[in-house]
């Protein structure tokens, strides 16, 4: 949980709303982020002891874009170690449960992003997909997962698995939410997000 940041961003969104200056449909919406997106001043370890203590100085570009759209960075989520497991397993940071069966694995590698949405902790989680890491946990947790075309969203500030295949994508409850989030991650202006 990025408590101080989340609180500050939520308060700023509330002030904008009160003043009639909302940035768009995602202004004030809390979003969870897979632990491979650089987050300024917050450990970004990709679920691995190998990267323990890695604290980036700036946000990943997709996080900057989402913040500019008014989203609230709720915190970082569990993931398969170094994004290398379609099951969502991680012996280093533990494995989150599957919403449909607490004894089942959630799918991965964006396991925590899926769990955060499936258990109603956030309306959207941001993950990465190289070989199914958004699609698998979305399917296993009754969510919508959007695997974007390689190159559509920036990988700047994203810990890579296979840079030529890696993509960034949202895990949400609805197709409409995924489409809105895609626009925010791209850096689209709010008007471009409307119908």
Feature locations, PLM:
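Residues forming well-ordered secondary-structure scaffolds
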Residues: 57-61, 111, 141, 173-176, ...
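Gly/Ser-rich catalytic/binding loops embedded in alpha/beta enzyme cores
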Residues: 1-130
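Short, solvent-exposed loop/turn segments at the edges of secondary structure
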Residues: 92, 108-111, 138-141, 148, ...
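A short helix-breaking turn/cap at a secondary-structure junction
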Residues: 147-195
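Glycine/threonine-rich beta-strand-loop-alpha-helix active-site module
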Residues: 88, 130-156
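Conserved hydrophobic/aromatic beta-strand scaffold that supports enzyme active sites
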Residues: 7, 143-145, 170
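Flexible loop/turn segments at secondary-structure boundaries
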Residues: 81-82, 132-135, 167-168
């Amino acid at each position: 949980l990025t408590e101080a940041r989340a609180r500050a961003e939520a308060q700023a969104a509330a002030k904008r709303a009160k003043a009639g200056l909302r940035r768009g449909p995602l202004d004030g919406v809390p979003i969870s982020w897979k632990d491979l997106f650089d987050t300024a001043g917050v450990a970004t370890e990709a679920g691995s002891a190998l990267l323990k203590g890695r604290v980036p100085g700036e946000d990943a570009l997709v996080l900057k874009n989402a913040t500019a759209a008014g989203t609230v960075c709720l915190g970082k989520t569990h993931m398969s170690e170094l994004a290398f497991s379609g099951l969502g397993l991680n012996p280093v940071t533990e494995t989150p449960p599957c919403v449909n069966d607490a004894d089942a694995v959630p799918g991965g590698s964006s396991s925590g992003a899926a769990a955060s949405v499936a258990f109603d902790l956030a309306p959207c989680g941001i993950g990465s997909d190289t070989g199914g890491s958004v699609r698998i946990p979305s399917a296993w947790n009754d969510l919508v997962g959007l695997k974007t075309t390689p190159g559509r969203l920036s990988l700047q500030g994203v810990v890579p698995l296979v840079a030529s295949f890696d993509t960034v994508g949202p895990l949400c409850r609805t197709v409409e939410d995924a489409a809105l989030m895609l626009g925010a991650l791209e850096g689209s202006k709010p008007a471009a997000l409307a119908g």
